[in-house]
Structure formats: structure tokens, C-alpha cells
Amino acid sequence: MTSASQYLYDHVTTKVLMDDMSFGDNAPRPGGRLPEFDLATVDGERISTRDFVGRKPLLLITGSYSCPMTASSDPVLKELYKKFANEIAFVMVQVREAHPGEHSEQPRSMEEKIKYARALKMRDELPWPIVIDDADGGLHHALDEKPNALWLTNREGVIIYRALWAGDDTGLQQALDAVCRSRAPALQDSSRRIVPMAMGIGKMREMTLQSGPRAAHDMWRAAPPMAAMAWLADLYRPLPPKWRTVAAVATLGVGVTVIASLLKKPRNR
């Protein structure tokens, strides 16, 4: 477990980004149970793990206002919510800010955390409740501190599926279908990165600029290739996030091809 000062970072670092790329050994996993919680929502109600055991499957998602992965996966989750909301409870946990900056500083009080959760719910028009983790991230620590992961439990409260990134809609779709039929999903543990990361990179510059210049600068320092791809993808902002990144990769490929062909041309003597 990280210390309070490490957990509530003010600058994204290479280590933070690398830690996000895989579940730790102690992360809740299929066959186990979620850590118990009883937390307030942005609407002033309370939600507990006990509310769902024996009654309804639960999809628990981590997210934050400044997180590009959250911003890019929320539209996908909203489409799934339309299909499964009557049978499965969707709940998001407001955790630490993924990309703090001058406009979205790392919250160190419950009041600040509630403010960001409300802003997230309003910006993305989220139909599900958001519960507020404590200022020091007690629940987030127990969930392995991932920025936009999710866990799906069955009616008995047993985890039947987890995903490192909520944007893996293919994996999640089959898991939601399975739990509605009281079956185990074919895929129970997803660490797929390509599609979720393409979506997140497509939103990254937009989200870091929202947080402030410091957040944008931190990405250039922590992961220059990713920051460069995000900058290029942002030029295609009218497109959906995933296709912004696809367009950026295509543009980069064309550029490299042109440069390579120019270098191969014989020089006139």
C-alpha cells in the first residue's frame, strides 16, 4: 500500500502510469469478494455492499473527473447501462484525481472530492450513482488503486469478472450477459489494453488541458510518446476518442513513410 503522500500525488509520474498497467497481487479477483464499504453518494444517500448481496449483481467502477480513461469509457458504459440497468446495479467510486492540475487539484478533503464527483456526474451525464471514497482513498487502496477498473459480482456477492480498464466493452458485454443468465462468463479477467488505451489517448489532451497546464506538462515528462500521440489525436477531436487515436496513428504512419521515401531518393550529383 502506498503512503498518503504518494497516493495523493500532485504530479503524474512514469511510475504512476506503469502501476496502472496491471493488477497487483492483492487486487480483488474473480472468485473473491469486493472489500466491504458503506459510503455516501453525491446525492446524499448511502450505498453499501450489503445492499446488493442476495438481491442484485453489482458492477463497481473506479473513476475520477480528470481521468481520460474514465471520460472515454463512460459513453460505452452508458450504452450498456441502457441494456442492463434493470438487472444489474451500476455504481462508480470517485477516487483520487488521475491528472491533477491547477484547475483540478488533488482533493484532500471530502468537500473537494464531492465537488469533483458532482462535476463528473454532470459533465458525462451519468445515470448511475457515484459513491465518494474517503479523502485518503481507503476503498481505492483495497481495490488496488487503479484509475478506471471495474468488478462485476453475482447475486451472492462473488466477483465473476474484473477488467483493468472499463473501456474493454467486448469483455464486459459478455460478462454482463452471463451474470444475467446466472452463468460464469467465458472471460473472467481482462487486462486488454489496445482499445481502452486508444480511447483514453484520444481524450488525454482534452482532459489534461481541462485540469491545467501542469497536468499537460506532467504527461510530456512522464510519457513523451504517449503525450505526443495524444497531442496528434487531439487534432481530430470531432471524431470519437478511439478514432482520434486511429487517425493519429495513420497520420504518423504516412509521415514516416514520406520521410523514409525522401531519404531513399538518390541525391543529384
Describe the function of each predicted region.
Residues K56-L58, N86-A89, L126-W128, P147-N148:
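Loop/turn elements at helix/coil->beta-strand transitions in domains of secreted/extracellular proteins
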Residues S66-C67, R96-H99, D136:
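Solvent-exposed loop/turn segments at secondary-structure junctions
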Residues M1-G54, L58, A166-R269:
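Non-globular targeting/processing and membrane-anchoring segments
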Residues I47-L77, A89-Q94:
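Short active-site neighborhood of thiol/selenol oxidoreductases, capturing the structured segment around
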Residues A71-D124:
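Structural microenvironment flanking redox-active thiols in thiol-disulfide oxidoreductases
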Residues D124-L126, D133-A175:
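Thiol/disulfide oxidoreductase modules built on the thioredoxin-like
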Residues V91-V93, V131, W151:
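Hydrophobic/aromatic beta-strand patches that form the interior of the parallel beta-sheet core
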